[in-house]
């Protein structure tokens, strides 16, 4: 039988194709030094796994002159934006969403493949970094938290299939922070274990744009994965987060001709004005109930009827009683005067006040607002609410308008040169799904610099 032997590491191959692939690998082989490496996987949620892995260790990583990366579940290119800033070149991208592929191609002159499951891994050009914002709908609060029972959750395995064959030096994966808590942490531990089994040391970090000066609270988990033969225990991956002041003004559109079309409707302005009368009635420094169900105030329930209500509703009705009794005369008059609008839509009768204790001259119109299925949510004006793919576009109440797609782009740290989808509804969804550029840029730049992959 003919065998093929590598003249550098003396490894033998029975098939010429495997020998050829070995000689063309990204990280050149070195004289064989067999070691048993015990890799401890540490996630910030305390997941641990030890896996013994016999590998070939090279003394130093080969530093690429031109960092190449692939962008899986690429969306509109949050990872792409970050890695191009690090002088990286994208050699492959894929996303199932047609509109995302169109936006991606328009901005980067690279046409993403459609379905990761149909990709011929062997056809993917060699690369140094794999990045993926793998589907979060299975794991986020906005989704149904189906975890790995859902097909989208299982797409995670497609990432590992590519890593197993192509063996990139680094992987950076992003997901919602709630992924740590699903099924009592079992899903998170499974992810860590599978990454480790694929041949990578992995640690995680939690980061939100507001920690980097971007006025959006959007906590995400970033998985930092380093190929076992490159991992160095002495390199500290707990990066110090710089103190950067929040700059709300940098987000807002200054040209009012560009914001006019985003004004809230007359009906929306009316319901917010009605609720603002209620807010004005509260005393300074008073704590508004987290959720007020005003259409429940005058209802009478027997003990049995109360038990039949959902537990969340029972809780809110109980918490609302003292508020109603304290301002009963006002509430009764207010409910009569505004019954038509308060009962027009179910959400109009619910107020989720998340703006803290009432301040002097406080008003609903001092804050950000979202019209959600759960009610009218009022958030402190310090940060924008988290952008989500589900249509809950934040309202900038001071100007009585929705934030624009361009403002959404800025909240996700995309440059003003980025070409938006022409359909606003699609653009909102795309930015709601996007990876925040500053968050992944911070993690990747610090990791790659620590390993001397970039200057």
Predicted regions: what is each one?
Residues 34-44, 48-51:
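Intrinsically disordered, low-complexity regulatory regions of eukaryotic transcription factors
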Residues 186-202:
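Conserved Class I S-adenosyl-L-methionine
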Residues 113-116, 200-211:
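Conserved S-adenosyl-L-methionine
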Residues 282-455:
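C-terminal target-recognition/interaction regions appended to catalytic cores
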Residues 1-38:
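C-terminal recognition-helix end and immediately following basic linker
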């Amino acid at each position: 039988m003919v065998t093929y032997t590598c003249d550098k590491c003396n490894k033998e191959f029975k098939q010429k194709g495997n020998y050829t692939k070995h000689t063309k690998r990204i990280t050149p082989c070195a004289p064989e030094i067999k070691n048993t490496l015990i890799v401890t996987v540490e996630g910030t949620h305390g997941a641990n796994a030890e896996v013994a892995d016999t590998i070939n260790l090279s003394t130093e990583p080969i530093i690429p002159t031109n960092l190449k990366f692939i962008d899986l579940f690429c969306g509109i290119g949050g990872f792409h934006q970050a890695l191009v800033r690090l002088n990286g070149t994208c050699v492959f991208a894929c996303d199932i969403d047609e509109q995302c592929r169109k936006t991606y191609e328009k901005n980067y002159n690279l046409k993403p493949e459609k379905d990761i499951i149909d990709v011929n891994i062997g056809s993917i050009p060699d690369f140094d970094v794999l990045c993926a914002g793998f589907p979060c709908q299975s794991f986020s609060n906005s989704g149904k938290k189906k975890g790995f029972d859902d097909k989208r959750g299982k797409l995670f395995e497609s990432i590992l299939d590519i890593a197993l064959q192509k063996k990139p030096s680094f992987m950076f994966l992003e997901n919602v922070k709630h992924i740590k808590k699903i099924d009592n942490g079992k899903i998170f531990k499974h992810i860590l274990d599978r990454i480790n089994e694929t041949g990578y040391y992995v640690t995680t970090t939690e980061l939100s744009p507001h920690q980097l000066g971007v006025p959006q609270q959007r906590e995400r988990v970033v998985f930092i994965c380093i190929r076992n033969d490159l991992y160095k225990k002495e390199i500290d991956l707990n990066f110090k987060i710089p103190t950067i002041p929040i700059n709300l003004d940098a987000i807002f559109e200054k040209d009012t001709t560009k914001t006019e079309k985003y004004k809230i409707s007359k009906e929306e302005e009316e319901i917010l004005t009605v609720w603002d009368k209620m807010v004005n009635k509260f005393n300074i420094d008073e704590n508004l109930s987290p959720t007020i169900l005003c259409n429940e105030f005058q209802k009478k329930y027997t003990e049995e009827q109360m038990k039949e209500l959902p537990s969340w509703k029972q809780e809110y009705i109980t918490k609302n009683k003292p508020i109603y009794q304290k301002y009963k005369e006002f509430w009764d008059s207010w409910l009569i005067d505004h019954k038509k609008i308060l009962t027009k839509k179910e959400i109009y009768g619910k107020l989720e006040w998340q703006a803290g204790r009432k301040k002097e001259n406080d008003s609903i119109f001092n804050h950000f607002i979202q019209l959600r299925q759960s009610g009218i949510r009022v958030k402190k004006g310090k940060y924008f609410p988290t952008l989500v793919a589900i249509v809950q576009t934040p309202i900038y109440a001071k100007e009585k308008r929705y934030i624009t797609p361009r403002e959404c782009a800025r909240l996700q740290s995309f440059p003003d040169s980025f070409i938006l989808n022409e359909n606003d509804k699609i653009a909102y969804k795309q930015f709601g799904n996007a990876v925040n550029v500053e968050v992944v840029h911070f993690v990747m730049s610090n990791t790659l610099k620590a390993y001397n992959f970039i200057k």
